[in-house]
Amino acid sequence: KEVDPTRPYTSSSPLFGWGREKSYTEGDSHYWGTWWGLADIEAVQNRTGRFVSEYGMQAMPNYSTTKKITLEEDRHLYSDVLKAHQKAGNGFLKLNSYLHRYFKDTTNVKTWSVKDYTYLTQCLQHYSFKNIIGVHRSKEPYNMGTLLWQLNDCWPVASWSITDYYNRQPKAAWYA
């Protein structure tokens, strides 16, 4: 309206920001209560907007990618190399919290192999997307759209993407 008052325009993406009640009834919604807010995956049942245009769950890159970007001595959780490829604030702690709630006791997570950790985080990401997308679909016609974050990465990293940076086998979440 500031540039061209003759054209209709609606500010959006998102109109109200995640976590604000109006974001569930007007415009599109970014729901990050799962992941950034550490809410249970099932919380989305009561947090579905009219069009949910951003939400996600992290996972490690495919193990073959981890092997390509690390030396053998760096293939342990919390190595400097793996930490450099995890850019989300407290990313590993968030993943561990969800793994503990949904899959396995993480008390001894430091003793797990990176291969096992990768597998479990990808199972978690698949479980998250499958359930969240299922809830969104069940809310039709109230909810008429869902866009997950994100499709791909710009470098090999632990992230929200559902495809592998090197275009290998997609992560498990691809099939959700």
Question: What are these model-derived regions, one by one?
Answer:
Residues 2-20, 141-153:
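Aromatic-lined carbohydrate-recognition surfaces of secreted/lumenal glycan-active proteins
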Residues 23, 30-176:
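Substrate-binding clefts and catalytic carboxylate motifs of secreted carbohydrate-active enzymes
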Residues 5, 27-28:
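A general marker of short, structured functional hotspots
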